[in-house]
């Protein structure tokens, strides 16, 4: 079973999350992803243990503010006795005095942040969900081209890294080379480099290079959403693959249960593979915006044939 310690969460967000109580229990285990709103638990309607981090924000503070001191204490006892691994107080939860008093019995780690609930969802909750996500490892290179996460695949030695280097020289962003960790959040896939290989790339004939040192911090990225998969194939060695000639529809490749848009690009000496990949990304974006070059071409041909027929 995957797990995350509260102290690991605190360390990850030490610049924006402060531990204000429960210092002895930061080894508590977070067993469930996400952040949990706990109004029903505060009302005593649920009695099962809480495995995820609880969040108290504007809604919960407003609810407590309408109660007497004794009622507030009982409500907070209802929550704390369910032993959540930690509780995060948002910026809107402005007065934790009663909570800290009741927590003397339970010593649940209480974290305070200047984030609102929405900001916590995009930062802390996303991080927690990533730790619990199913992770697959795939051999390839991950970049961000024109804002689109592109996973380059292909057999070893076909030139993925060299193609990626060309794209980096065109100011596209580098995420990782060789062993890419891919994880699913909802119906979206994200990718990152393995920790040991982060920032590094192997170029045959040159060796290992540190992309961040060579090209600067601005050219690297920690992770990206994978929207497009491009498989490089040797044109000389392919006898079974029928390559797309018109491109009326986007192919799909399933990865971790998510269908990714997929291109197969033949490579051979003299072909500018990096420019073809840039064109593939533009084609992908245009198709998603509703424009299809192949269909436009077909309609144009039909119009020409019709005009010639009418003239004859």
From Swiss-Prot:
Q: Where does ATP bind?
A: 154-161
Keyword set includes Magnesium = yes
The region called Important for the catalytic mechanism of dephosphorylation is annotated at 266-271
Gene Ontology biological process terms, A to Z: regulation of carbohydrate metabolic process
Q: Name one Pfam family in it.
A: Hpr_kinase_C
Task: Tell me the impact of changing residue 156 to A.
Answer: Kinase activity not affected and 4-fold increase in phosphorylase activity
Alphabetically sorted, this entry's keywords are:
ATP-binding, Carbohydrate metabolism, Kinase, Magnesium, Metal-binding, Multifunctional enzyme, Nucleotide-binding, Serine/threonine-protein kinase, Transferase
The enzyme class is: transferase
Q: How is its activity regulated?
A: Contrary to HPrK/P of B.subtilis and other bacteria, that of M.pneumoniae is active as a kinase at very low ATP concentrations in the absence of fructose 1,6-bisphosphate (FBP). Kinase activity is slightly activated by FBP, and inhibited by inorganic phosphate (Pi), but FBP prevents kinase inhibition by Pi. Dephosphorylation of P-Ser-HPr by M.pneumoniae HPrK/P is strictly dependent on the presence of Pi, and is inhibited by FBP.
Coiled-coil regions, chain positions: none
What EC number is given for this enzyme? 2.7.11.-, 2.7.4.-
GO terms (molecular function) for this protein are:
ATP binding; magnesium ion binding; phosphorelay sensor kinase activity; protein serine/threonine kinase activity; protein serine/threonine/tyrosine kinase activity
Region Important for the catalytic mechanism of both phosphorylation and dephosphorylation, annotated ranges: 201-210
Q: Which reaction equation describes what this protein catalyses? A: [HPr protein]-L-serine + ATP = [HPr protein]-O-phospho-L-serine + ADP + H(+); [HPr protein]-O-phospho-L-serine + phosphate + H(+) = [HPr protein]-L-serine + diphosphate
As a miscellaneous remark, the entry gives: Both phosphorylation and phosphorolysis are carried out by the same active site and suggest a common mechanism for both reactions.
Q: What does this protein do?
A: Is a metabolite-sensitive enzyme that catalyzes the ATP-as well as probably the pyrophosphate-dependent phosphorylation of Ser-47 in HPr, a phosphocarrier protein of the phosphoenolpyruvate-dependent sugar phosphotransferase system (PTS). HprK/P also catalyzes the pyrophosphate-producing, inorganic phosphate-dependent dephosphorylation (phosphorolysis) of seryl-phosphorylated HPr (P-Ser-HPr). The regulatory role of HPrK/P in the physiology of M.pneumoniae is not known yet.
Task: Please give the PANTHER family that the UniProt record associates with this protein.
Answer: HPR KINASE_PHOSPHORYLASE, PROTEIN YJDM-RELATED
What protein name does the entry list?
HPr kinase/phosphorylase
Gene source species: Mycoplasma pneumoniae (strain ATCC 29342 / M129 / Subtype 1) (Mycoplasmoides pneumoniae)
Task: Give the encoding gene's name.
Answer: hprK
């Amino acid at each position: 079973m995957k797990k995350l310690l509260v102290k690991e969460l605190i360390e990850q967000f030490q610049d924006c999350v402060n531990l204000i109580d429960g210092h002895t229990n930061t080894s508590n285990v977070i067993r469930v992803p996400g952040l949990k709103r706990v109004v029903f638990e505060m009302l005593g309607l649920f009695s099962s243990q809480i495995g995820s981090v609880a969040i108290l924000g504007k809604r919960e503070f407003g609810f407590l503010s309408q109660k007497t001191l004794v009622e507030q204490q009982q409500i907070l006892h209802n929550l704390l006795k369910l032993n959540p691994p930690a509780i995060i107080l948002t910026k809107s939860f402005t007065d934790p005095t009663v909570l800290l008093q009741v927590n003397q019995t339970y010593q649940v780690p209480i974290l305070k942040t200047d984030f609102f609930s929405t900001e916590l969802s995009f930062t802390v909750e996303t991080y927690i969900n990533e730790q619990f996500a199913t992770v697959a490892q795939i051999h390839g290179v991950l970049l961000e081209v024109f804002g689109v996460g592109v996973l380059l695949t292909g057999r070893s030695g076909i030139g993925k890294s060299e193609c990626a280097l060309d794209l980096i020289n065109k100011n596209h962003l580098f995420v990782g080379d060789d062993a890419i960790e891919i994880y699913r959040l909802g119906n979206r896939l994200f990718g990152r480099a393995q920790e040991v290989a982060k920032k590094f790339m192997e170029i045959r004939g040159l060796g290992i290079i540190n992309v961040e040192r060579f090209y600067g911090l601005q050219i690297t990225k920690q992770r990206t959403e994978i929207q497009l998969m491009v498989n490089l194939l040797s044109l000389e060695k392919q006898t079974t693959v029928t390559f797309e000639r018109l491109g009326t529809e986007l192919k799909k490749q399933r990865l971790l249960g998510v269908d990714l848009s997929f291109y197969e690009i033949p490579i051979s000496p003299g072909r500018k593979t990096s420019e073809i990949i840039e064109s593939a990304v533009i084609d992908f974006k245009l198709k998603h915006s509703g424009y299809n070059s192949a269909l436009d071409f077909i309609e144009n041909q039909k119009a020409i044939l019709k005009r010639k027929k009418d003239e004859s």
